[in-house]
Amino acid sequence: MKKISNILLAVTFALPLFTACETDNDSNPILNEPDTFTLNTPAYAANNVYDLKNAQTVELTCSQPDYGFPAATTYTVQASFEQDFIEATDESKANYTVLESTSPTAKINVDASELNNALLDLWTAVNGEQAELPTEPVAVYIRLKANITSSGKGVCFSNVIELPNVLISKSTSSLTPPKTMFIVGSMLDTDWKVWKPMAGVYGMDGQFYSMIYFDANSEFKFGTKENEYIGINDNRVTVTDKAGAGVSGSDNFVVENAGWYLFYVKAAVKGDDYQFTITFYPAEVYLFGNTTGGSWAFNDEWKFTVPATKDGNFVSPAMTASGEVRMCFKTDLDWWRTEFTLHDGEIFYRDFNLIDSWTEKGDGYSIQGSAGNVIHLNFTAGTGEKK
């Protein structure tokens, strides 16, 4: 077997995330639709082995697509064993794999385990279930897809780069992403007896979310099952506070600032255990679709008002047109991954491949709105209504 040396644990693409801002003039920016953008070849790619089993991340860097103005951009990693990426047709599958995790910046820390598993699946798809995995490094080709965040606009693809020495390995762990996630704490009940189940992010195994009101200095823990009690001091846990919640603690999580937050948990398999990433997002709920006159982006004109109390209602702006009501939370993901509706007066979180309408789920899942209607949502009670 070829000796593996100089194991590279990170590969590099870099560029800060630019976001649109107001200018001194009243003109609207004009969207340029670029054909491509530059993905950088790592400086030492030719002489190093990317051992995905023993690496943590593969770091990539690229230039931002030229949209004609600074725009928040989402990057998706695609990988193939062939230099020419071939799209799927009615007769054949695509010859590349797409990683589920995306990046909001042009410096992308690709999870090595996720890349390894994606390449394993692609190898099996190309060579058959009985095909042996190569014991020596193989060439892997990478490209990026970019689009303007939370929209279908500005889609373009980077150039293809080669990583000539990538070692992929069979997973030695039988652990799979958790199917459930719960949160418990003083903001739910003072006796810590209520284990609140969280909604699963559609299409993202091991990821969960819940809109929760935290009293000032609330304390809580979470778990993949009831009575697991995972705290902030667990070395498997990292916390990102994007909402100014003021998260701290030495055992229990402590939320300093009272208010509504979207609590988000990502559980990733790392060997024989999980790594948990906790994110606090602002409590942002939006109307989408036909009842807004056709808005399919996070437009603050269609953001719900946030109540000041635990038992208050989130209230939508008045609809301006007729059609099916579409609602979602704002995270770093595509809007439809955290979409929900109302069914028999209760909030129902998307759990299926919705193509065009909630009618595909069954009777009573599609809310039909008209001009002047508003939606009231009570996330503490888990209920809602159209008025």
Curated annotation (Swiss-Prot):
The cross-references to InterPro entries, in alphabetical order and at most eight, read: SusE, SusF/SusE-like_C
- Known outcome of mutating residue 229 to A: Impaired binding to starch. Abolished binding to starch
Q: Where is this gene product found?
A: Cell outer membrane
Lipid linkage positions (N-palmitoyl cysteine): 21
Instruction: Give the family, as the similarity comment puts it.
Output: Belongs to the SusE family.
Assembly: Monomer. Interacts with SusF.
Q: What is this protein called?
A: Outer membrane protein SusE
Native species of this protein?
Bacteroides thetaiotaomicron (strain ATCC 29148 / DSM 2079 / JCM 5827 / CCUG 10774 / NCTC 10582 / VPI-5482 / E50)
